[in-house]
Each structure stands twice: as C-alpha cells, then as structure tokens.
Amino acid sequence: NLLFPDGERHFVKSVRYFRKAIDDDPMLAHEVAGFYAQEGSHAREHQRFFTILEEQGYELDEFLGEFRHSLRVLQRILPESVQLAGTAAAEHFTAIMANHALESRFLDDADPKVRHLLLWHATEEIEHKAVAYDVLQRVEPSYLVRVLGMAVASLFLAYWWQRGTRL
C-alpha cells in the first residue's frame, strides 16, 4: 500500500512518455486514457489512507521520502523503454496480487473500509493490467528490454516491500 501513490504516478509518467507513439491506435489510446484515470484515482485514495495512518501515529515521511528518491534515481539512470518495461512488470505483479485479493479470503477480517479500498483497487488493476505491456509491445518489442524491466521491477519491489514491513 505504501508504494502505490508514488509508484502509480511513476507508472503514468512511464506510459505518458510514449503517448505520441500510440496516437494512431484509437483503441490503445482509449485504454491508456483509462489507465491514467484509474491510476490517478488509486494514488489519491491511497494518499487519503496515508493521512489516516499518520493520524494514528504511523511515521511515513522518512520511508516515503526514501522511496521517492529511489524512483527519481531510477528515472535518471534508466532509459524510458526500460522504465516502461518495469511498469509493465510491476503492473503484472499488481494484477497477480489483485487476483489473489479478489479470489481469496485473506481480507475477510480486515477493517471494512480498508477491505473496500483494496478490493476496489484490485478490480481496477485487473481492468488495465495489460495496458503498459501493450504500449511497450508497440514502442519497444525487444524481449531483452522486457526482461531487463522485469529484473529491475522485481529487485526494486522486493527491496521496498521488505523495507515496508519494518514500519
């Protein structure tokens, strides 16, 4: 949850960089517009959730500041195509988790508002799970770039998920 707002803003930025390359595909352009809207909604709602956590005494500023810094470093050093491939990979991971959230009972005992937030988010993640991948295939179909993006996303997410469990 802690990675969502900034991560989703990064996802939108990585897709938006290639927007002109998809202008001639109205269906993909429509899907991308929906992706932007959904990711923006997710970021706003999770940011509201952060406010509640902070009101309850959770200290998020240091963690989130370090996470934002690490995203900026990746944005500086990685080519845009690898950033997009990383977004496609992260969206794949998110879709797997979303599917699990929707099909399992692990959220049954969660606070009803938290459960609603996470299930709403999961449903929308399933809806746009392939958009970043479709853009990637259109602008940079290289398997090597896709694998590199998956490696970067895997290591990045594993590190930050592990860090987030210590809060």
Feature roles, as predicted:
Residues N1-L167:
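Non-heme di-metal
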